[in-house]
From Swiss-Prot:
Domain ABC transmembrane type-1 stretches: 73-290
Ranges annotated as spanning the membrane: 17-37, 77-97, 112-132, 151-171, 208-228, 269-289
Entry protein name: Lactose transport system permease protein LacF
Gene: lacF
Protein origin, superkingdom: Bacteria
Annotated GO biological process: transmembrane transport
Annotated compartments: Cell inner membrane
Described function: Part of the binding-protein-dependent transport system for lactose. Probably responsible for the translocation of the substrate across the membrane.
Length: 298
């Protein structure tokens, strides 16, 4: 009898639990799962606007022969390969410096470093475009101290335009990642570092062989989120180049290309859906590789 009552009670709580989460599941299904599945079906069609016909792998053939897609893919990979390691390294170093209990005004420094990620995207884009213009403060400063002989075309030269985008997103998101590392560092027992110091381990050794291994779960998390964010890079490129991805498509990313295919050029929803699944595939593969590289080895 008691067993039957416990079983009934468990079933009651199970049903109640599902009823509580049912509205959230329904909303997720309507606003997330359905668009994902719909875009997958849409990628099997070709045409302009809503005048579509089934083509199977037609969009994949178009993708393979599309030079603009390959340019956007190359730019996205460059941003990922260059920017993410720089940002993660800087965030780690800043967190280690701010974790020093002897550092004065650490709260002020934390606020200053974190502030860019909560600043207005449009405002900071306008500020960066002004600072890095031909007669902006950056060029004037570099000219004044003799580093360059003529102004750099930060917004007009393909190479320097990429550099500017990398500088901008690194400036904006380094503080965001630093907060995660700082929170993790403050949960590490200081006696571990004191013992290592007594044993004669230098500061770089304590950082490399104590701090980094203990922060591995947080590093994995921030690396994956940064990877996803960089592969979906859109905001900075759109605001800096007014949606063109210029000069000469040198800053065009996959996300901006999808936007242009959908809203800027003659609508090609099905082809845009196909390109979007390239981002999904890249995120899945890179996330798996990062999880695999960070796995616990016996």
């Amino acid at each position: 009898m008691a067993t039957t009552s416990r079983s009934s009670l468990k079933r009651y709580y199970d049903v109640n639990g599902w009823l509580f989460v049912a509205p959230a599941i329904a909303l997720i299904s309507v606003f997330m799962l359905y668009p994902i599945l719909r875009s997958l079906v849409l990628s099997l069609y070709t045409g302009r606007g809503m005048m579509l016909k089934f083509s199977g792998t037609g969009n994949l053939v178009r993708l393979w022969n599309d030079p603009v897609f390959w340019q956007a893919l190359q730019n996205t990979v460059i941003f990922f390969v260059v920017q993410v390691p720089i940002m993660i390294t800087m965030a780690l170093i800043l967190a280690a410096m701010l974790n020093n209990p002897k550092l004065r005004y650490s709260g002020l420094f934390r606020t200053m470093i974190f502030l860019p990620c909560v600043s207005s995207l449009v405002a900071y884009s306008i500020l960066f475009k002004s600072m890095f213009s031909l007669d902006g403060v950056v060029n004037n400063t570099l000219l004044a101290i003799g580093i360059i002989g003529e102004p750099i075309g930060w917004l007009t030269d393909p190479f320097w335009a990429k550099v500017l985008i990398i500088i901008a997103i690194t400036w904006r998101w380094t503080g965001y990642n630093m907060i995660f590392y700082l929170a993790a560092l403050q949960n590490i027992d200081r006696s571990i570092y004191e013992a290592a110091k007594i044993d004669g381990v230098p500061s770089w050794g304590r950082f490399a062989f104590l701090t980094i291994p203990m922060l591995k779960p947080v590093i994995l998390f921030t690396t994956i989120t940064s990877t996803i964010g960089t592969l979906q890079l859109f905001d900075e490129v759109y605001n800096f180049t007014e949606g063109t991805g210029g000069p000469a498509n040198s800053t065009l990313t996959l996300s901006l290309y999808i936007y242009n295919l959908t809203f800027r050029f003659m609508p090609s929803f099905s082809y845009a859906a196909t390109v979007s699944y390239v981002i999904v595939l890249m995120v899945a593969v890179l996330s798996f590789l990062q999880f695999y590289a960070a796995r616990e080895r016996k």
